[in-house]
């Protein structure tokens, strides 16, 4: 039976067999197990910092602790000790614990001091032009020169906006200080249509108007060609009363034509023909590498408009090329280093770095995006229309000081006070019909409709043209699918009233001033709050009233609410269209959709035909190259080959003559002249 013997731990059982308090031993075993379980639980819940002792001492301590545990008996309420035991003060908080009962305080982002405490520009509803007080007229502003006032009057500007009143005198005063005091770089965050272009154009023109020789002293960089053209026109009008020259660089013109307007060469030296250059990033890189004599060593102002977009890496890393060019041509620094700490360093660095001016309606509050520019003691100007009220302001524990802290305004996207925001809920399949019904219901005659892509703009334009066939409203497309020339023509027709509505992609949503837009429609939900701000910014510009309407589906509501919450904005007023629009316009809508499908098939076939044509042309060219080696020789090629053979034979005959004896060489043998050799060659060819 020894094969079936099972050896078990019987030490405690032996004590029970001996009859010495059998029941008490069972309680002791249970108590030991509970204590060990509680000890293991405490080790898992808290991290204790303990010095590592020597191994021998550790084993002895373990034995002593085990012997002590055997002596202590606590049979009553064994779990209460674990529950009432305090956690040591040197232990860390357990991650993942159940602290839902305690209210967690929201962590505030730590910003640099200049971002956390901006200079607030109080904005609001602008007064109509006829109600401008006499004290606010441009003639009464002592910091504006006479030629500036004359140019502004020609532009039909009677007063300055709040942004201009703050920024223009500050820049002029900063440059009035004597060396070595450098002007601080500035960032301006203001709503669209608030006059940011004149805010930097006026002080630059006034500060450069007394220049002696013509050099590039101001560089204005903008993201798109249309916006660059708009800024170029504004600066050109301001310079009309001065001798300053303005040059526009964009891919809408030939590079050679721009080079002629930019530099000229005289007696081996290059001279600049422009004082102010307005450009796009890509075109700037082209001229930095391709235009000889284009030098920026005298650069005094670097203006970056729409700074949040233009600082992205997608613009060919233009800042790197600009910095490299400046370092190669002069000892001037573009990016700069840390702020000088003494008078000698201030004096040595004075005039070696341009004054940087950044402008945007959605200026980023991320310091990393502005790090590449290395701004010199920057200052932020931010526009606030109304004092925002935080949602948690009325709850207990709310930070009341934060309500008056200027840092709360950083990153807030503001819209003009004259803007009315609305939305309309519809079905996805009825979206084009809803846009048509809204235009007809409210009799909008000047509107923009934005989509998320150029292809969507093309399709929507086709459908709306069919729906508006029987009406006086005319719509047209304005997207990246069109050339720059066609886009400019469409904008001119819209400004002249020949077109009532433009169906646009988001390429037009930034900075471009389209005259007298009454309504902006968002056909598709914008992907980000910045896109929405720039879309609605095409209306309610320069104190005029405007309306922004977003067409939504039930599925879009959640995303749109989240987008607006980022700007502390609400949904606005909901507007409706007739529920019978599908029945009323069923025939036209069906015809439009059928035409769209056929147009889509037609475009697809055209693309396939173009692709096949290109492939066939490439194949023919390849065959021509292969057969070029076996084609028969022409007469000229045969004559050339025969002439080469005669030349070779004449060389051989001359070599044989040189190998004659010395006696023969002493005899006089006149050499053949060049004419005789040519005559022989022609005679041989004739034979």
Swiss-Prot record:
GO biological processes: rRNA processing
Notes concerning its domains: The Q motif is unique to and characteristic of the DEAD box family of RNA helicases and controls ATP binding and hydrolysis.
Source species of the chain: Drosophila melanogaster (Fruit fly)
Superkingdom: Eukaryota
SUPFAM superfamilies the record matches: P-loop containing nucleoside triphosphate hydrolases (SSF52540)
Catalytic activity: ATP + H2O = ADP + phosphate + H(+)
Gene that produces this protein: Dbp73D
Chain ranges for the short sequence motif DEAD box as given in the UniProt record: 305-308
Amino acids binding ATP: 190-197
Protein name: Probable ATP-dependent RNA helicase Dbp73D
């Amino acid at each position: 039976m020894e094969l079936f013997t099972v050896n078990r731990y019987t030490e405690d059982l032996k004590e029970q067999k001996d009859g010495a308090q059998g029941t008490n031993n069972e309680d002791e075993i249970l108590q030991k197990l509970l204590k060990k379980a509680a000890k293991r639980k405490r080790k898992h819940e808290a991290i204790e910092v303990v010095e590592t002792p020597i191994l021998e001492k550790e084993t002895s301590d373990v034995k002593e602790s085990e012997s002590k545990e055997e002596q202590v008996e606590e049979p009553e309420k064994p779990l209460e000790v674990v529950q009432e035991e305090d956690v040591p003060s040197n232990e860390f908080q357990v991650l993942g614990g159940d602290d839902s009962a305690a209210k967690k305080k929201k962590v505030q982002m730590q910003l640099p001091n200049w971002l956390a405490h901006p200079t607030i520009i109080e904005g609001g509803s602008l007064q109509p032009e006829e109600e401008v007080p006499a004290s606010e007229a441009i003639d009464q502003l002592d910091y504006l020169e006479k030629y500036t006032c004359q140019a502004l009057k020609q532009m039909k500007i009677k007063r300055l906006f709040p942004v201009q009143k703050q920024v223009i005198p500050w820049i002029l005063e900063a440059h009035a200080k004597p060396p070595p005091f450098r002007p601080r770089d500035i960032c301006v965050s203001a709503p669209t249509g608030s006059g940011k272009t004149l805010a930097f154009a006026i002080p630059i023109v006034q500060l450069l108007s007394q220049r002696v020789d013509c050099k590039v002293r101001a560089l204005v960089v903008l993201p798109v060609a249309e916006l660059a053209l708009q800024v170029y026109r504004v600066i050109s009008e301001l310079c009309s009363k001065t001798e300053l020259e303005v040059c526009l660089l964009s891919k809408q013109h030939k590079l050679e034509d721009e080079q002629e307007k930019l530099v000229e060469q005289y007696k081996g030296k290059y001279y600049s023909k422009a004082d102010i250059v307005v450009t796009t990033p890509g075109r700037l890189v082209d001229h930095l590498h391709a235009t000889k004599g284009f030098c920026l060593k005298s650069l005094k102002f670097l203006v970056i408009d729409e700074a949040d977009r233009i600082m992205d890496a997608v613009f060919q890393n233009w800042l790197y090329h600009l910095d490299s060019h400046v370092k190669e041509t002069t000892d001037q620094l573009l990016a700069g280093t840390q702020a000088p700490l003494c008078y000698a360093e201030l004096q040595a660095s004075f005039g070696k770095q341009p004054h940087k001016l950044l402008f945007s309606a959605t200026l980023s509050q991320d310091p990393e995006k502005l790090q590449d520019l290395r701004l010199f003691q920057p200052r932020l100007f931010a526009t606030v229309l109304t004092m925002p009220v935080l949602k948690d302001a009325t709850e207990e524990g709310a930070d009341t000081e934060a309500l008056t802290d200027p840092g709360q305004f950083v990153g807030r996207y503001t819209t003009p006070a004259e803007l009315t925001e609305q939305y309309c809920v519809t079905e996805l399949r009825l979206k084009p019909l809803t846009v048509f019904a809204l235009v007809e219901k409210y009799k909008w005659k000047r509107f923009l409709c934005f989509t998320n892509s150029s292809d969507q703009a093309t399709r929507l334009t086709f459908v709306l043209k069919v729906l508006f066939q029987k009406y006086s409203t005319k719509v047209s497309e304005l997207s990246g699918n069109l050339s720059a020339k066609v886009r400019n023509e469409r904008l001119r027709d819209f400004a002249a009233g020949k077109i009532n509505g433009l169906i646009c992609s988001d390429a037009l949503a930034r900075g471009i001033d389209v005259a007298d837009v009454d309504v902006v429609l968002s056909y598709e939900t914008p992907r980000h709050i910045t896109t929405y701000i720039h879309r609605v910014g095409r209306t309610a510009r320069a104190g005029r009233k405007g309306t922004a309407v977003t067409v939504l589906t039930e599925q879009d509501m959640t995303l749109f609410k989240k987008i607006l919450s980022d700007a502390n904005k609400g949904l606005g007023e909901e507007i409706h269209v007739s529920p019978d629009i599908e029945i009323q316009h069923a025939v036209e809508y069906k015809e439009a959709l059928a035409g769209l499908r056929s147009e889509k098939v037609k475009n697809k076939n055209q693309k396939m035909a173009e692709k096949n044509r290109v492939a066939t042309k490439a194949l023919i060219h390849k065959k021509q190259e292969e057969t070029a080696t076996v084609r028969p020789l022409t007469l000229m090629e045969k004559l050339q080959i025969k002439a080469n053979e005669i030349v070779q034979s004449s060389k051989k005959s001359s070599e044989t003559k040189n190998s004659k004896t010395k006696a023969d060489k002493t005899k006089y043998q006149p050499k053949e002249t060049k004419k005789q050799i040519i005559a022989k060659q022609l005679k041989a060819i004739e034979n």
